[in-house]
Amino acid sequence: MIVYAVNMGIVFIWSWFAKMCGGRDDSLATGYRPNKLLIWIPLASLVLVSGLRYRVGTDFQTYTLLYELAGDYQNVWQIFGFGTAKTATDPGFTALLWLMNFITEDPQIMYFTVAVVTYSFIMKTLADYGRPFELSVFLFLGTFHYYASFNGIRQYMVAAVLFWAIRYIISGNWKRYFLIVLVSSLFHSSALIMIPVYFIVRRKAWSPAIFGLSALFLGMTFLYQKFISVFVVVLENSSYSHYEKWLMTNTNGMNVIKIAVLVLPLFLAFCYKERLRSLWPQIDIVVNLCLLGFLFGLLATKDVIFARFNIYFGLYQMILVPYFVRIFDEKSNALIYIAIVVCYFLYSYLLMPVDSSVLPYRTIFSR
């Protein structure tokens, strides 16, 4: 626990210094750019804690095995299915691991490399869209996404790239966004969900179409058994067909506290939608992305597998939530800032012993 506490302190304090030593930049949505040099310090802390971990995280052994199996391929063409009966699952990621095997057979290089890529894209995005910057970075840990990224590392890496690509949703550059999604799908095929998402989130927040989509998800949640029988047919011939039986019989779902954390920012965003739009007209896109995260969270109360989709949407809370410290008078904003830090710290503290197997923390130096 002490490692995580020190890491959080370093990340928060040095992100604050980066903000204080930054300067005005009207090319950014925030109008302010943190100090580019100082950003490297919190980034380094995030990478080191994640990249040097050993047997930490629910999926650690699974990814270690994937790394070893990737080294068994004879060439990259075999990974992508040229001249073989079947393409490797998520061939882009498998090819990356295959290349790493030429450097070392130690899978720790995989964890370190993925940490560098994932957190670099997230920090870059928060530097462009997060204000106050240090609060956005703190929320990466406070919302538990940082610790959850120790599991499902390839999906979090893809989610980080698509998080960075929000600039193309905002600008309406669908060609670049779709290209990034297609390349990302080679690393995790679920990234393809972001193609229809592009068209959904560019609508005005709280519009009839968005309310209609929300009603659809509510219906799927309440009529879950009927919905899941259709969903299983979709999975039947995919690389995820092994989930069929598990989906039909599993009753383990996302807990109510996580749902509350997803819905509260949306409630505030609805109540103060005009104030938010006055600060940044494109905030509707971020609100819609957060809403999709909540809707998938509702489905995840029936089966936790749907929480995997929330990986793509939960990151946008790091952009939305800090806006709430800018919509009231100065004194109220300061109180809200403190409340956000305290509440999200307690949230991550309570989750840590029971979620994602991040405790106890061990490093490669203890193996």
UniProtKB/Swiss-Prot annotation:
Taxonomic source organism: Bacillus subtilis (strain 168)
Superkingdom of origin: Bacteria
Subcellular location: Cell membrane
GO cellular component term, pick one: plasma membrane
Protein name: Transmembrane protein EpsG
Transmembrane feature ranges: 1-21, 37-57, 77-99, 109-123, 133-153, 180-200, 215-235, 252-272, 279-299, 304-324, 334-354
Chief location bin: membrane
Function: May be involved in the production of the exopolysaccharide (EPS) component of the extracellular matrix during biofilm formation. EPS is responsible for the adhesion of chains of cells into bundles. Required for biofilm maintenance.
Keywords noted in UniProt: Cell membrane, Exopolysaccharide synthesis, Membrane, Transmembrane, Transmembrane helix
GO BP terms, alphabetized: polysaccharide biosynthetic process
Entry-linked InterPro entries: EpsG-like
Induction of expression: Repressed by SinR.
Membrane topology, from the record: Multi-pass membrane protein
